[in-house]
Amino acid sequence: MSAFQNGGIASRALDDDSDIEEEALANDYKEQVQYEGMEELEQVNSMSMAQQTDDIQSRLAAAAQPLDFSAPLEVKFASYDNYCSLFHFILNSDGPVDLEPPSYYWAWDVIDEFIYQFNSFCSYRNRVARQGTNEEEIQILREAPNTWGCYSVLNVLYSLIQRSQINEQLAAMRRNEEPMAVAGDYGSKSLYRMLGYFSIIGLLRVHCLLGDFSLALKTLDDIELNKKAMFARVMAAHFTTYYYVGFSYMMMRRYADAIRMFSHILIYVSRTKNFQKNAQYDSISKKNDQMYALIAICVAFHPTRLDDTIHTALREKYGDQLLKLQRGGPESLPIFEELFRSACPKFISPTPPDFDNPELNVDPLEHHLSIFMDEVKTNMWSPTVKSYLRLYTTMDLKKLAGFLEVEPEKLRGWLLVNKQRSRQIRWTDNGLLDGEVVNSNDLDYAMQGDLIHISEAKVGRKLVDWYLRNLARTY
């Protein structure tokens, strides 16, 4: 799980050529990297409140502490009970709890650890059910179907958001209005405001783990992905947000947007890694490698020019594999599968498994992998077909079918599907689900009966920008 202790100011708005803002971002990070941890909560003066405050402080601190992956089942159950008790106290007390959280980092760590334990428990429970060998654990899990249940976790996150009125506050800020005017009694307290804010990022993550990628992106409607966003002050939250947004875009076949998200955070990490503590950088290195695998997949579907830093690293990590992905064909299938398995989130099922019929329990990862591989197989011959179409301005359908050794009608169906897939929504502004429909390919065609009309629209490389960028790096 992510356990970063230092944060950086967020990056630029998503402009592909904004190198100046990226440099400013790196400089801002250097200034803030000296953060040494959380400050102690101020003690309440009233002696009658001292014991209660000490108890709350210990519970707040414990909620942010990571649980060992190999912890026994009893410990996982106890951790769930502790979270339920803490969130019940925060949400259902008579009025808002009058405590200041130690820092932004604490609020993120609590939500992050809460979701990590939920994810870990669901994966563990599904694995025990599919194996069907440990009768003692099966009986314990069967008797507690609601422990770390999907409904309970979502209820906590939505309740924190609703209590804090954080969506209303963010909407007011986007309208340049005073957020405190709509915050209410709870939202005016930083404890609720920060927990509510990071619960939105948590919902993005949970909905993505459940496979609802549209709803995952919808949860961020009121959060602007720019350097002023609160999540950008916490490195772990910054990284997590862009990973799950990018992955959701990829699964929705919006590859240009996915590449933009992955590129943004990869450039940010490459420019700040020398200023991060070793433990922090080690903790994000795995996710960093996962993003390179995902961007390799996206570039295979949507060839595009990448930042030189990313392009070089991608060639070093996946040189031969990347070439096979871009060539397509049957030999690319195992590489797509390997990269997806290594880079995807640890998907979970929204319902408890069937302990009585282990063979009926489907691994959520295998389910989403099969959906992804169907898309890969649909586009498998796209590079080969394009290589023929580029040689002509008009071409007979039967002639192309002869080259490819397929039936003409089967080829016609594939061409129509591929043309439809080439029309992608590209994000420009407002919500992450919004955008304008663009042609994602540099090759377009239209069919008139059996005659294929082909047009090629290449975007010339901006040589001036390339020279200026490389001259600046040289001198």
Swiss-Prot record:
Transmembrane segments: none annotated. The keyword Magnesium does not apply. GO terms for molecular function: translation initiation factor activity. Disulfide bonds: none annotated. It comes from Sclerotinia sclerotiorum (strain ATCC 18683 / 1980 / Ss-1). Its main location: cytoplasm. This is Eukaryotic translation initiation factor 3 subunit L. Component of the eukaryotic translation initiation factor 3 (eIF-3) complex. Keywords: Cytoplasm, Initiation factor, Protein biosynthesis. Belongs to the eIF-3 subunit L family. It is found in: Cytoplasm. GO terms for biological process: formation of cytoplasmic translation initiation complex; translational initiation.
